[in-house]
Amino acid sequence: MSNKSEAAILKNLEKLAVHNDPIDQKLYSQYDVKRGLRNANGTGVLVGLTRIGDVVGYELKDGQKIAIPGRLVYRGYNVEDLIKDADKNKQFGYEQCAYLLLFGELPNQAKLEAFSNYLGECRVLPANFTEDMIMKAPSNDIMNKMARGVLASYSYDDDPENRSVSNVIKQCIQLIARFSTLAAYGYQAKRRYYDNKSLFIHNPKPELSTAENFLRLIRSDKQYTRLEAEILDLALILHAEHGGGNNSSLTVHVVSSADTDTYSAMAAAVGSLKGRRHGGANIKVMEMMDDIKANVKDWTSEKEVGNYLKNIATKEAGDRSGLIYGMGHAIYTISDPREVLLKAKAKKLAKEKGFLEEFALYDLIEKLSPAIIQEVHHSDKKICANVDMYSGLVYSMLNIPRELFTPIFAISRIAGWSAHRIEEIVSGGRIYRPAYKNISKEREFVPLMDRK
């Protein structure tokens, strides 16, 4: 079939789909459909219970949302306390965070060392995996490559269908350990086969943290500073878990409830996170910032920056979506604790890397945006910057290319996904089966030879 013929066929099929699939938006209100599993007041529909993580941004009083400063809680502990403890002991904290999410308890020093050593031993991919599953089948999209890598791992597992808790824990720990390697090698394959650049394949070092190993694997000289590794470690901690209701974690629960294998569940979660509405938000922030920097002459002028932000909010500038990316969150109202913690460390990195002028622009946008959004939308809803406002800037200062931004999210969130899979199995939940109402009328069948 020629390309022209295929295009014509697909165009006709597209017309049918566009004509027959749309649903009158009024019907969603008529049938009280909780679109996106959201209630009318913006809160999420309660579909499950979890002990793993909690996202706190408001309190409910008489059915009304009352804004409060945001908190991110892992297994009952405020994440800010975990980070402070790691800083105090001059340790990287992601591994301790992963242990806590998986097993529900804070490890002592001996348990943490044993767990970190186990992760280190698991970072190396199976024999021939790199050559056969990554280099021989590169992808221009690293999240796509990671999903394929997860599914391919099934074939390298001696007992992939064993869904005992101990075996699932083993599978999850191996995936947590290997995600940074999968992402880094997928990136190197893309560089070689799609970007025509030099290929560097370094072996992970078992004694290094997840953050250190990742920086080592993506850089040709394998070098990084302590501050660089610390801020990446912080980003990994802050993205590791966000409650059971976020799209990718819910995906893990839904797919796991069907009693499938670990690799299928995790690949589905990667597919969810790959979506532009979920894992790609910090890239949208960076694209918006590129546009602002190109069109605003004086980055220090509140008037000039504010006027351009208003043009973005009124769909007269930027990508014409009307969104000031990096602002607002479904749950956080007064503050996103992840943004607060990452911003503080980002300023230190900006000073080291010579990015203070750019950091000040981000800070000004964060300051001006809430009032502009409220003015344009005639709303008094409280709006705060979210973690995506600064995460992209942090990765850029680390000289990490944008195609790795969402994979870093996955490297972090695999710990939370693993905890949710184990929780779903241990809790023995039923298969997810929500309702969909069919609104089509029944029609009289027309035999093939009688159709026009």
State what each model feature region is.
Residues M1-K452:
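Non-transmembrane, aqueous-exposed alpha-helical and coiled segments at domain scale
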